[in-house]
């Protein structure tokens, strides 16, 4: 029967007339001429100018030329000259094509066809006839699967004549199937002819033809994979236009793809057993219905074939399927492989330097179906079964039409694609010229074996070898050993004989090592698997023969070791009498590449001794395991994928026909090969077995170790005589009863050996990165919050616990992110797993301790206060980190491989150690944490049912919230870790739930980060407040964000009640804080009156520590306007003069130094007002500046006398201020649990908050400290009378005129903010005015009248300096007018300019002096009790006796006129001292009781000051009686006065006794503290008289003791220096004159400040007392000695306020420059 072509282009009987493509060559420098017959034109297929063969155009046999030389545009150049022409000539020169490889002689090669000029389309590129022809092979079974009988086997049909067809196409349907054709009786046998191009070189084949596979070629099994390919994809333009690019295998897919399955077909003749059909997954393939054919009986097989059929009857056009019948061009092994038709073998000469031919076969690769359908079923649209038998080919009426047949064939071909097989070309017949030469030499009789061996080792190490060279080399090795066995007898000398054989052995070992080297791996891949096994066996036996050649030569005990790169060979000759109990090979220092070991027992050696000697040959090989691969046991799809990567070998499973259900089992060689021999190639049986310890090369995803040896006869591994004794993850111990080459075979479970991220899809990988990044960012924010705002919290155990938890979580996240990127071969893998294990254990431990701490807090006294618990925290540190490190260390010591050999680098191996050291501790910690949480919850429920105090309820609510947060935190963290664990475990087995666990981990991990930020940062009110402060004080944010737009009094202005405008409305029903000196009853009445009169109710607001919000003119400030009259509050359009409202969350700005003890910056309380004029309309009431001199406290604390200021006619210009802003500090209780004793230890930085409230003036009693008085002359200064009695002063006109002038000048200068420079003048002026007013009213009451004091003398020196300040654009706060020294509060009257007031808000509880109005109590009693009774009486006596003045200001304002008055004062002093002593004793007892009391967080400043002396209720009643009798200030101040008086009196007595001992006769008690002993009689110099007034002493220093001790030390030091331990006096702090320069203007830039400081001379500095050592005060030279006046130095210092250790806001100066 005639054969029909599938393409339809050729007639049935025209197979021999098909146009053939021809090849033409032209050497470089010559012309290539192509000619076709008349009527035909040239159709170029491909061309190249370069060199692909070493034999073409190489007359001299040069082997150094490049054979990988190609000019890519060769075809384009030839097409421009020859396309569609009958003949053409092209010069083969670099001028035409370029020079792709300089130095190599090139040639031009062209493949073309001569086609008819009438043809309009390109014909096929190959001359071979169509492959789809009838096949007379045996029919297949009905289900498409059948038993394949190799040719010649029983049951197989006689092989038909060789056909140029595609044999072994896979069968389709069952009985009566479409292609089930009976074997024909006759077959047309056509063979493609070859023609030689005229002028072609002799011996070169004209075209690629289909040839018979050489004998011994085994294509049934794939060869080992190629680790690195030399393939490059070229010549894509030579592909047919209809061929998709995906069908052209490139360098990577020149062989079967990694997920292919190779199936062996049948057909053909001779040794060629057909084309290999491979399967490949095609996810886009449309589903096909299952076959209706019933399975036939017979043996099933995974190998299925298609009968060779005649496709021409189908009438199918080959245009669509032509591309599926060719393998694309590619480069491999220095050869260019042209496009080859499926089923053909491409044959060409070997690469340069080698002789022989190279072959490569093109086969079809079939895609694997996606589901369980039969991949060979018909199209779903075709449901009619084809008739059975051969009727389809002869009776067209009973068959499908030809179009249907072509459609069905297309459906079949769509599942195939061509590919090259095997993975690399077959170069078994290629032999290098050098090795051929060596083979000729070794066979010569007089050849030098040593020279040949040396040359062979050199060639194999430096030259490129091919598959045939491996065969030649191993053959030479065996030949050399055989010849040396005969030649050694010619050496009579034993030593010479041993030396010759040893040198030969060294060359042979080196040659074998070269063959095993990685550089020669491609040479092994040139061989088919059978040849590889044969060469490996020959190499092992050749090495063994040469080794025993040396061993037999040695006649005494000796050991010879030959060590090269890949082979360690040891020859040992042992005497039987000296054989140890066991012989071990190799030594640890001999072979560091592996820890394998062979141990031979002594009895087994004695049985194989000869002549009293035992000769043993040991060998250890590297890289031989990649050559000696095991045979196949099972096969499946996953195995094939693993095979390509890991050199595993696949085989067919005849027990199952369903390939998808075949069990996976791949056997790999998993150890190095080690050898021991007692005879030449003999498997000697031993009386006692030997012991082998072999290390596993791969420890993951392997199982079932088997001890095997290499069988020389079968060229395969065998387990006979060997058994497995024991095994672990890294080693196996075997026992064998014979000797040969040993190794370990293991089954591969899964061959995924890569990082965790390689199995993630794209979305999951991105999500994991995002999730971990979010969690890490929020954890870092939480850590920074605890670090930056640590002053907000008490240093408690809970804060430390959460800090440690965050650190552990941060380490876990980073280690996890780093670990999933590593592979198990990475050096960091083990370290990451170890540290991750430790971090997880530590984090779980800290969670347990957090729950325990909550339980401990509820069951102890710590419920009321959160204090520092350093000892307990230290135990937590020890238990958490100590236990974690100990557990990990024990785990590492027991089995280090648990960390180093794992699925991924973030998880330990799932063994007993993993569950004992990881799972168990984590579960214990978590269960304990949950248990303590439930216990804590039960206790809270019980406590909530019992009656508790308000503070306990508050604290209990806080603990309840913490427990809830920590419990949710624990559950969320458990979800994160569990999802990560199940995800990693599921990823190993590719479970369906793995993706679910992965996305659960992503979600839970993201929620964990958000939860940490929200509930541990944002939810905390203190942290929120600190966030606002932090944002406002940093310039990198816009000012609109840094400056709050809500005033502190915004809640009052809006009239929204107590919670309106406040920062936190959690507790809006708290009891309002009382101002200083106001009782609760009076406060309640005042509140009602304020609500009726429109006065704002007291409102508390927490102020921030610092702020950059400057009080400039452009900023609008809220004020009270016309609300006090009508009861309504409104916001004015313009701010009023002198009114500064502090913005909520900020503080008053100062340019002082930052406080070193403040938690979040300096608490600046010193402030300045704007100099801004505001017209006052009728009926308006507004805030004045804090005006202390014109404000009156009602005598009885009520409101009757205060109501006279409220009238319907409006508020007069001189009306006092009706509301004030009060600032006070509340501190969290600390660990002292009581009041700080004087001279006690300095505690840590106090933590609390500064509060601001607005209250009516009648409710506020101010405590200005750091005041000093001046004595002036009223005759020279008429404005003093005006200051004392402003409405009736005779100098009012002069004063108003001066003030108007100053206002105009200040408005012209446009001053933006009042300065902080000259606080001393303001302080002097303020205190002096108060004292003058006291003295005036007292004299009026007793009937006496005295002259007003004159201004201090030192002020006269600086009058011009004060005036000059106006021209520096820096207005001093208390500059004097031109007409005289103005000592008054300039903001006291409505028409006056605004002047800032510098005020310390809280009074020092130790010894600060307070000032009160004269109307409240007698002035003499004030001065007798303010600082010290005896002190001021002594001062007055000194004034009377000597007429001296105190530093420019009199303390009393006048002298005592009579001795009776002095005696009366002394009598009152003694009575007062007795009362003070009794009170002090009671206070001392009360202080002891107060140590156990807790201070409320919201205690007011008045309450704190009250508690600082004593808190006993009985003592308060007694003190109130005294206050009522003598009209004294409130009781808390009285107690302070008594304590100060006792201390000063005691110091005075001790000081006087010391003076008497020294022989002094003067009563120093009558001298002022500023006068030195001995100077009173003569009268001190005016410059020496300085008053010490209202300065607290240091440790052991009272307000007067400091001055006396200072004077004593100055006398001893010749009045040149002061004691550094003495506290500075007020006049030193604020004084002018010779004592030091005046204070500077405040708001300067740092540059201006530095420039002025550089001009100063060095000044001595002294730190303050020990309890205020964090603040620097500026001392001045003491004024006791006479100093000449000198011009003032304009040094500028800044005044700051800060909180000291006594919880007092102190005002301090900037230190002078040294």
Curated annotation (Swiss-Prot):
Listed GO MF terms: carbohydrate binding; G protein-coupled receptor activity
GO CC term, one of those recorded: plasma membrane
Extracellular compartment spans: 1-765, 821-826, 895-911, 988-994
Membrane topology: Multi-pass membrane protein
Residues spanning the membrane: 766-786, 800-820, 827-847, 874-894, 912-932, 967-987, 995-1015
CDD domains tied to this protein: Gal_Rha_Lectin_dCirl
SS bond list: 707-734, 722-736
Bias type Basic and acidic residues, positions: 1524-1536
Residue intervals of the GAIN-B domain: 558-752
Record PTM Phosphoserine, positions in chain: 1155, 1245, 1252, 1317-1318
GO biological process: cell surface receptor signaling pathway
Domain (SUEL-type lectin): residue spans on this chain: 26-115
Compositional bias segments (type: Low complexity): 186-198, 272-282, 290-301, 1296-1315, 1330-1348, 1453-1478, 1565-1580, 1660-1675
Glycosylated residues (UniProt): 143, 253, 299, 338, 395, 652, 701, 728
Compartments where found: Cell membrane
Keyword DNA-binding part of the UniProt annotation: no
Residue numbers on the Cytoplasmic membrane side: 787-799, 848-873, 933-966, 1016-1714
Chain segments carrying region Disordered: 183-302, 373-397, 1229-1253, 1268-1287, 1293-1354, 1447-1536, 1551-1694
Record InterPro entries: GAIN_B (IPR057244), GAIN_dom_N (IPR032471), GAIN_dom_sf (IPR046338), GPCR_2-like_7TM (IPR017981), GPCR_2_extracell_dom_sf (IPR036445), GPCR_2_secretin-like (IPR000832), GPS (IPR000203), Lectin_gal-bd_dom (IPR000922)
Post-translational modification: Proteolytically cleaved into 2 subunits, an extracellular subunit and a seven-transmembrane subunit.
Keywords (A to Z) from UniProt: Cell membrane, Disulfide bond, G-protein coupled receptor, Glycoprotein, Lectin, Membrane, Phosphoprotein, Receptor, Transducer, Transmembrane, Transmembrane helix
Site note Cleavage, residues: 739-740
Self-association and partners: Forms a heterodimer, consisting of a large extracellular region non-covalently linked to a seven-transmembrane moiety.
Stated family: Belongs to the G-protein coupled receptor 2 family. LN-TM7 subfamily.
Protein name per UniProt: Latrophilin Cirl
